[in-house]
Amino acid sequence: MFTKCISCCGLAIISVFFACLFVENCAALQKTLRHYEIFHKDDVVHRVVKRGAKHSTNPFNTIKEVEFTTLGKNFRLILHPHRDVLHSKFRAYAVDADGNETVVHMDHDSFYSGRVFGELESSVRAHIEDGTMTMSIHLPEETYHIEPSWRHLPEAKKDTMVAYKASDVKVHKNEAGATPKTCGYIKEGLELEDKEHGDTLDNELHTREKRQSDQYEYTPTKTRCPLLLVADYRFFQEMGGGNTKTTINYLISLIDRVHKIYNDTVWQDRSDQEGFKGMGFVIKKIVVHSEPTRLRGGEAHYNMIREKWDVRNLLEVFSREYSHKDFCLAHLFTDLKFEGGILGLAYVGSPRRNSVGGICTPEYFKNGYTLYLNSGLSSSRNHYGQRVITREADLVTAHEFGHNWGSEHDPDIPECSPSASQGGSFLMYTYSVSGYDVNNKKFSPCSLRSIRKVLQAKSGRCFSEPEESFCGNLRVEGDEQCDAGLLGTEDNDSCCDKNCKLRRNQGAMCSDKNSPCCQNCQFMASGMKCREAQYATCEQEARCTGAHAECPKSPAMADGTTCQERGQCRNGKCVPYCETQGLQSCMCDIIADACKRCCRMSINETCFPVEPPDVLPDGTPCITGFCNKGVCEKTIQDVVERFWDIIEEINVAKTLRFLKDNIVMAVVLVTAVFWIPISCVISYFDRKKLRHEMKLIEWSQKLDLIHPSDERRRVIHIRVPRQKISVARACN
């Protein structure tokens, strides 16, 4: 009886332990998500439809229908296999402790893209393996994410998945209540002269200059950046669950979602210019370290056993790998937790011909090592020490690639760091973003301008041309006249045939699937609305012309129309409130007025709050950080950013701004400039005085009594022989 009681007590204790562990994991996930649901893979219905009797390698030959219910919504997904992000020479390898590579064979057909049934403006990116799904579902009003439960809830039932909305992702705060930095970035080295390719590059540049009297005439034809993805042993164990294929599939799915962000971006200098789009990524090689690397010769290795790494040191060690030269970019994925909650680091690209860092960079020599600075890294461990969710991983990786492509952090100006009421922060914001605000997955105008210059200058060196542009992907490419996607490949579209040609013999003038001003295969009547009004940019709604299938450029709003931040439209641009009053916009430097709208008479005048007082929206930059409910809250400075900015481009204005923003360090620096030389002089005289005193002490102990100052006086030593005295014995 006693033994039975002991057994029951033991089982109870074990049950309580695992229950507490599960609750702890749930609580950890609740720090990241406001709400989530768990469902089993058996709750998902899969249906596969074969398109024809003949086998075809066309990805649209097979349609997979997936249906399930979660988060109060029924999802019916229409999916097809796709390999957009896999290079034709794609290879994946598992690497052991001695560096031996083993080829890993992958099922490329487990990656899907598609749409939600009945939702015209929807898109889906998914990976399905043994019924367990990792996917992102984009709808006009919300984005849904699904991923395996084990990644965040180790004690959850096997074969279950976590579902959550993008709007339920929390923005993390650090101990001081500020939003932590997403990453740092590095500008390494100065201009390097690549003698071997100098003449070739000069000719290339000269030819391009002649071709680019208008810079918008040049559109890159090589649009894919080949990637090397490396997972260290920590990432393999934590995010891959100790399974090589799971790790590889996670990375492919991640890059697939990041590729969509880039591929849909129009790289332009100004909104009234066309720019170019379709720039993205393709994975050429994946390396997964299944165990820590054994060190040889005492050299540090990015995959060695080390509990704590400085993030910058880790990136530099990773950049020593010779194989990086064969790729556009190399990226390391780790599960290390870095100081300050940093989630990533990358070298910044530059449009200058021989600068190092970012895409298509020449090699760089530093401290006896050859570095390949087309690199970056991301961590899957946030500042809480928890694994990042899919949404966070997407944004962090996209952010680091943005640095590699040439963008620095968005400056604190309204154009590139708008408030939440104006769409929120953009992708390249210094601090982490939730991913829910409309701008969080977009590049700011500042980033667009920077990256565009780098792409035009360097993409031709190491990018590759798209290998699979095929009929049926809803994109009009090459000699296609239209592309109706899924319906078109079944020859069921009334405007576009299965060969992506317009059905002109049936009177088709355009395709409803590809042109906003096309309806029933005909140009829409003149005056039909095709684009909504944009008050933030002072653009009216656009209407079809009746003669073309494309939506024309939006006309400017009438002068005097109210636009963002109480401004007014003038000549098609939103003029800030202060300028409409004949004043200049500025930022009050008095804390009490820091979150009020302020103006000044001229550039050298003092800022003053307008009357009646106008409190700035939450998220607006202020003198020490960002406004929150009318109070200017201090945030952490991005020291790495400012430091490398100054080294890269030293000028008086930037130096003064740096000193002003870092007043404590400035005081220490200025004090040191004066104190160190003075200390050296004082120390010199102290030592001289000490030597003099030591000589005096030494003189006082001598017998010749010659003062040290009498150096010219000669001392003559006279040796006097002593007389020997003999003692005679008397003999009696």
Swiss-Prot record:
Name the record gives this protein: ADAM 17-like protease
GO biological process, one term: positive regulation of programmed cell death
Molecular functions (GO terms): metal ion binding; metalloendopeptidase activity
Region (Crambin-like): 598-662
Organism of this sequence: Drosophila melanogaster
Mode of membrane association: Single-pass type I membrane protein
Names of the cofactor(s): Zn(2+)
Residue stretches making up the Disintegrin domain: 468-559
Residue intervals on the Extracellular side: 212-662
First-listed, main subcellular location of the protein, grouped into a coarse class: membrane
Motif Cysteine switch positions after renumbering to this chain: 181-188
Region annotation Disordered: where it falls in the sequence: 196-217
InterPro entries assigned to the protein according to its UniProt record, in alphabetical order: ADAM10_ADAM17, ADAM17_MPD, ADAM_Metalloproteinase, Disintegrin_dom, Disintegrin_dom_sf, MetalloPept_cat_dom_sf, Peptidase_M12B
Binding positions for Zn(2+) per the UniProt entry: C183, H399, H403, H409
Localization terms from the record: Membrane
Entry's cofactor comment: Binds 1 zinc ion per subunit.
Enzyme Commission (EC) number: 3.4.24.-
Domain of life: Eukaryota
Bridged cysteine pairs (disulfide): C225-C328, C360-C462, C416-C446, C530-C551, C569-C578, C574-C586, C588-C595
Residue ranges annotated for the Peptidase M12B domain, each copy included: 223-467
Position of the signal peptide: 1-28
Keywords, ordered alphabetically: Cleavage on pair of basic residues, Disulfide bond, Glycoprotein, Hydrolase, Membrane, Metal-binding, Metalloprotease, Protease, Signal, Transmembrane, Transmembrane helix, Zinc, Zymogen
Record's GO cellular component terms: membrane; plasma membrane
